[in-house]
Amino acid sequence: MAEQEGLQYGKADFVLMDSVTLPEFMENLKLRFEKGRIYTFIGEVVVSVNPYKNLPIYGRDTIEQYKGRELYERPPHLFAIADAAYKAMKRRCKDTCIVISGESGAGKTEASKYIMQYIAAITNPSQRAEVERVKNMLLKSNCVLEAFGNAKTNRNDNSSRFGKYMDINFDFKGDPIGGHISNYLLEKSRVIVQQLGERNFHSFYQMILGAPEQTLRSLHLQRDISSYAYTRSLAQLKSSNNDAGDFKEVAEAMKVIGFKPEEIQTVYKILAAILHLGNLKFIVDGDTTLIENGKVVSVVADLLGTRSEQVEKALLFRTVATGRDVIDKQHTEKEANYGRDAFAKAIYERLFCWIVNRINDVIDVKQQDASLHGKNTVIGVLDIYGFEIFDNNSLEQFCINYCNEKLQQLFIQLVLTQEQAEYQREGIPWKHIDYFDNQIIVDLVEQQHKGIISLLDDACMNVGKVTDDMFLEALNKQLGKHAHYSSRKVCATDKALEYNRDFRIRHYAGDVVYSVVGFIDKNKDTLFQDFKRLMFNSSNPVLKTMWPEGKLSITEVTKRPLTAATLFKNSMIALVDNLASKEPYYVRCIKPNEKKSPALFDEVRCRHQVEYLGLLENVRVRRAGFAYRQVYDKFLHRYKLISSLTWPNHSLPSDRIAVERFMVDCGLNHDAAYGKTKIFIRTPRTLFSLEERRSEMLIRIILFLQKLWRGTLARRRCKRIRAGLTILRYYRRYKVKSYLREVMHRFNGVKNSRDYGKHVKWPTPPRVLRRFQEALQNIYNRWRGYQIIKSLPPAEIPKVRAKVAAFENLKGHRVDMGLQRCWEGSYLASNQENARNSNQFVSRSNELQRKDKFMQALFSCHVQKVNRFNKVQDRAIFITDRHLYKMDPGKEYKVMTSTPLYNVSGISVTSGKDQLVVFHMKDNKDLIVCLGCSGQGPYDSRIGELVGVLANHFKSERRPLQVTVSHPIQCRQHGRSCSITVETKINQSQPQFTKNRAGFTLSVPAN
């Protein structure tokens, strides 16, 4: 029951009234209307009073207040009933429907739009693009259908002139995935004639008043509704409709839905063609019927994609087939006018049906496999014309009111009859509540062979000329004694009925007088085949698809089509069966006054609606009855998890006993009754309490299941990881063994080969053995080197080590390292190198050995040296394991300077073929020399030998020696930095130092 509203607003639920009487009901309804509370509950039924003004109660904030809430938690609202239908559909996977009923102008169409708005707002929390697209198109379809199916009447500015039932399909998550729209009985007669003060369909005015000038010119239209016969009745009538703005909104909606530009243009052409058809006038010249304004025919032909002579022939002649002969029968003026109007009505009806089908093509649910996507559920929303009583009521009003009788019958059967019958069947104590059952009125209309529709069909099928008077006579004869039928002939004293024209039906909503004038023609719904062929042969493909029967041959005999009333009756029976298969929710709309005033509450008018809608009886049944009932096994299946007595399964003798024990255990036994097969729960609060407890337990069970499932997944994952690691371990072992076998196979016997396996290509190792292969290659290289070296004489081994040291320090940096020649070491002691002075050098060397006690002479050579005065001198260098001696070859190799070898920190050379060497000293007195520049011996490359000998010696003594290859070479002399560059000269025979600003330049021969 509704809460959170103060007593100053009256009772939010009529069930809470102190006494169930009509005066108290009306007093509460009036109070709530005056306080701006237009919605009131009757249990799970919403009573809605049209406020005739915009209220700020439909925004996003209001939607959030009702989302996921139970009925009793919030004040009465359309959103509450919409949410209840949505939750029922989602919780129980059962199709639901919302039936909106009430008379014309009671606010049914607006109610349906707010319900659609709410459903769209609360779904698709994950913002899936496809769901958003479907929601948008469902909402936009309302705008389009209102434009082409609604009109202004004297009772309603936006009256639905057709019946609409929309199914919204939801996936298993509760998100809309599509829908389907069914339309019923478009009031197409409104196209050609409207009652005083009423309008044609909105679409005509929207196009005339809202279309751009260029569009109007292409349609041969003027921005003047009084220029067209079919809209002229509104010329001086003021309307609250914003037609120009609505035109843009409808055009945009059609684009969003998916109408192609050429399809939208065709729609405008059809509307324009209908307006021009209405302006066609016929005249009689002797026995010939002619068209007075022939130019209009050309315009119509152009708009419909046909030739003007074909249009003219269809309007003036009717093709009749007699056997094999085909003749053209000319119309009289009356027949021509009838044919023109019938053609205009048919075109508009086909257009409307095509629009509905076009929308359905877009929003229909595509075929889905229920095993993959889950079961689709449906919420149906019925927005259909309300009960109508006009000054002149014809076949359209008769069908509309019959529709309302069927819906009232459904309400009675589901809410009143079936509910009370179920209580008696289940053995629940119950005091019967009387109500008016309108089945007798439904039978009066639809009964086979005896009902009004059957009698109307019989009249239409009779051979010869049958008039409306003859139909009325048949009604009087067959139904004269029926309690709900009357006519002037049946009741001669009733002067409100005109003789041979009117009959009265006592509907559940009141007495309605119908005029039989036009019943026969409207029921036959005659449209000459010539018009169908004309449209089928149109060059416009959209128009062609609207008239498929136009392809039939002129001489082909066709089956008599069902009449308009029978088609409508069949569709209503199917609709009611469809609604009865779903769980219904009701919105009962009430019209507060006839003046469309937001402040006036016409108590007499409202009381009449309350009475014929059966709202008071609804309150009595709801107050005395039960809000919820369910068979025992399904009840247990949903709620057994709440109690330990029933979870996971009970051991009691029957489900009924288990349910009784369950309700006692939950402390809710006071609000339940137990039938033979079902449990009945009186108040919604008890049901909501069960739902809350179930939701709480679901969380615990879900967590428990998640724990078990996550544990299972973790164990499975652990097993897979262990299995994977085992496989990986064995695979690695296999790869290692395969690799080692391949290495052993390839290097088998390399010890006996000439190059010790240098030519053998190493196999590609597994990733895990890459570092191992690098180490193995190092071991192999050391072994191969040992194999090569061990065959050398002991005296050659130091030279080999020196060459290795030179290679390690100069590889990739210097072009010529002299590795291919034999290294002499002490070139000054060589007779070949120093034939004239070698004895002098040997003598000086022996003297120094005795003096300095060195163990080994490493290197000696003539050099060109730059002294401290930046002068170039010929000198010799002698390097032992202890000192670096600088000697003067001109003075019998007199020692000029002796530098301890530990004072040498590094040497620098260039990358070219020159013999420039810089000895870097720790005291910054670097020695700059060019090897082999004395002119006493052949010129060759000794840089590699010098670097190798020194590097190998320093390595053996575990001292660092920095070897630098650069150009220019940077050095320091007497504390100053200088730079030495090397350049090549063609016409120079010997290397030569020259002074420059930065230091020195060494010029070397080109060859």
Swiss-Prot record:
CDD domains: MYSc_Myo1. Residues 9-695 form the Myosin motor domain. Residues 572-594 are annotated as: Actin-binding. Pfam families: Myosin_head (PF00063), Myosin_TH1 (PF06017). Residues 699-719, 721-741 form the IQ domain. ATP binds at residues 102-109. Residues 812-1006 form the TH1 domain. Signal peptide: none annotated. It is found in: Cytoplasm; Perikaryon; Cell projection, Dendrite; Early endosome. GO terms for biological process: actin filament organization; actin filament-based movement; endocytosis; protein transport. Keywords: Actin-binding, ATP-binding, Calmodulin-binding, Cell projection, Cytoplasm, Developmental protein, Endosome, Motor protein, Myosin, Nucleotide-binding, Protein transport, Repeat, Transport. PROSITE patterns: IQ (PS50096), MYOSIN_MOTOR (PS51456), TH1 (PS51757). SMART domains: IQ, MYSc. Disruption phenotype: Morpholino knockdown of the protein at the four cell stage disrupts body left-right asymmetry at the level of the heart, gall bladder and gut. The left-right organizer, a transient ciliated epithelium of the gastrocoel roof plate, displays abnormally short cilia and disruption of the normal cilia orientation toward the posterior pole of cells, leading to disordered flow direction and reduced flow velocity. The keyword rRNA-binding does not apply. GO terms for molecular function: actin filament binding; ATP binding; calmodulin binding; microfilament motor activity. GO terms for cellular component: actin cytoskeleton; cell cortex; cytoplasm; dendrite; early endosome; microvillus; myosin complex; perikaryon. Its main location: cytoplasm. The keyword Ribosomal protein does not apply. Belongs to the TRAFAC class myosin-kinesin ATPase superfamily. Myosin family. Unconventional myosin that functions as an actin-based motor protein with ATPase activity. Plays an important role in the establishment of left-right asymmetry during embryonic development. Required for normal cilia orientation, and for normal, directed flow at the transient ciliated epithelium that functions as a left-right organizer during embryogenesis. Plays a role in endosomal protein trafficking, and especially in the transfer of cargo proteins from early to recycling endosomes. Interacts (via the two IQ motifs) with calmodulin. Interacts with F-actin. Binds a calmodulin chain via each of the two IQ domains. IQ domain 1 mediates interaction with calmodulin both in the presence and in the absence of Ca(2+). IQ domain 2 mediates interaction with calmodulin in the presence of Ca(2+). The TH1 domain is required for activity in complementing zebrafish defects in Kupffer's vesicle lumen size. This is Unconventional myosin-Id. The gene is myo1d.
